[in-house]
Design a protein with these regions (language model features):
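A ligand-binding cleft/hinge motif common to bilobed small-molecule-binding domains
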Residues: 114-118, 239-258, 307
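Paired acidic/hydrophobic, glycine-rich loop segments that form the ligand-binding mouth/hinge
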Residues: 101-109, 239-245, 260-261
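Periplasmic-binding protein-like
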Residues: 138, 153-154, 182-192, 213-216, 222-223, 294-317, ...
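Extracytoplasmic ligand-binding site segments that recognize negatively charged/polar headgroups
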Residues: 54-69, 80-95, 103-237
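A bilobed periplasmic-binding-protein/Venus flytrap-type ligand-binding module shared by bacterial periplasmic
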Residues: 159-164, 201-202, 271-283, 294, ...
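Immediate post-signal peptide segment of exported/extracytoplasmic ligand-binding proteins
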Residues: 21-54, 72-73, 178-184
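Extracellular/periplasmic bilobal clamshell ligand-binding domains
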Residues: 320-358
Length: 358
């Protein structure tokens, strides 16, 4: 399989007219400081004096705790805090906080590029060009550079319990999920999920407008987190996950769970988990230091170990036990503005499909 992704063609044009010429001309510091495994332009002493760092993220709490714990291990003087919600709810939270002039978070990660672009347009990010950004492809970074950067690539396939469903009987294609035998046996994510939106956005053109109308008759149940989804699969409450997050399968399989994962031939919808420093955050120096650490091979490996997520960096290996990006057929939106505009209609239709079945 080949990596199939014409990523972010619209990104080059986005944001350039939004920001002043002075902002666009921001550059890397003259003499980045060499740390243990990464370079930084942050004032490390000031970051440690701030003594704290706050991350908002869509990732499950146990993985977040491991990730910020690894940062805290590298910088023990900086106490780390995290908060987790699905993308839509998390974005609503930070917008509400900013409207109330309550600046509580230093770095935010959202798994929905439409929300990231909207936040950039609203001036929600502060520009900081990390020395580690040079290792990321242009399409994985904001224009101008320094407002946000892809921290990981997440992809969705089909998962099943291989103790309940033999491999020969498991669905092999997206169309197989329409088989009546899967009625009342499928779970998905709620409409607040950036990845679920990506599944919808990329599969509709491939499978036709009627696909999701037919899928609705399967009576899928929606859940907030892949932890819930895979937990129900392991317990036998559901038989299949449609749009199953691959990192969740890797995580549960590593724990000995009987999970089978299918890579449909037509491809795996994929989106990014994107990180940026929030403008007006309470610990700006710690935020810069975190971004430098996180975007480096050291931080990216910590992410892979904590959450089984794939790094966009070519020099970072995939999570243990995972297929590398180069071996996947990824379906990544090429027009993120269209993706952003599609969200309201997706949310309305997806909520109708799942109804109250949660």
């Amino acid at each position: 399989m080949k990596l199939l992704a014409t990523v972010g063609l619209a990104l080059c044009a986005l944001g350039a007219t939004t920001w002043s010429q002075a902002q666009a001309q921001a550059k890397l510091c003259d003499k980045p400081r060499q740390m243990d495994g990464f370079k930084t332009c942050a004032d490390v002493e000031k970051a440690e004096a701030e003594g704290a760092f706050v991350l908002y993220s869509t990732d499950p709490e146990p993985g977040q705790a491991k990730l910020v714990g690894a940062f805290n291990k590298a910088f023990p003087k900086i106490k780390t805090t995290y908060f987790r919600l699905q993308a839509g709810a998390l974005y609503a939270k930070i917008l509400s906080e900013r409207q109330a002039k309550s600046f509580l978070v230093d770095v935010i990660q959202i798994s929905d590029m439409g929300m990231i672009l909207d936040f950039q347009k609203k001036g929600g990010f502060t520009q900081y060009i990390s020395p580690e950004m040079a290792a990321f492809k242009p399409e994985y970074k904001s224009k101008p550079e320094g407002y946000w950067t892809w921290g990981s690539v997440i992809m969705a396939g089909i998962a099943y319990n291989n103790k309940v469903t033999p491999e020969a009987e498991a669905p092999k294609t997206w169309e197989d999920l329409l088989n009546p035998k899967w009625i009342d046996a499928i779970n998905v994510k709620v409409s607040n999920s950036g990845l679920q939106h990506g599944v919808w956005f990329m599969l509709k053109p491939l499978l036709g407008e009627d696909y999701f109308k037919k899928f609705a008759t399967q009576k899928p149940r929606a859940f907030d987190s892949y932890v819930q989804q895979y937990g129900r699969l392991v317990d036998g409450q559901d038989k299949v996950i449609m749009g199953a997050q691959y990192s969740g399968a890797i995580e549960f399989t590593a724990k000995g769970a009987p999970i089978g994962f299918v890579f449909p031939d037509k491809g795996l919808p994929a989106v990014s988990e994107t990180y940026g420093i929030v403008d007006g955050g309470p610990h700006p120096h710690a935020a810069q230091l975190f971004m430098d650490w996180f975007l480096s091979p050291v931080g990216q490996k910590a992410l892979a170990e904590a959450l089984a997520l794939h790094s966009p960096r070519d020099d970072v290996p995939p999570p243990p036990g995972a297929v590398p990006l180069s071996k996947m057929k990824l379906l990544i939106p090429a027009d993120w503005e269209a993706f952003e505009k599609d969200r309201p209609s997706f949310a309305k239709e997806w909520d109708r499909i799942v109804g109250a079945r949660r």
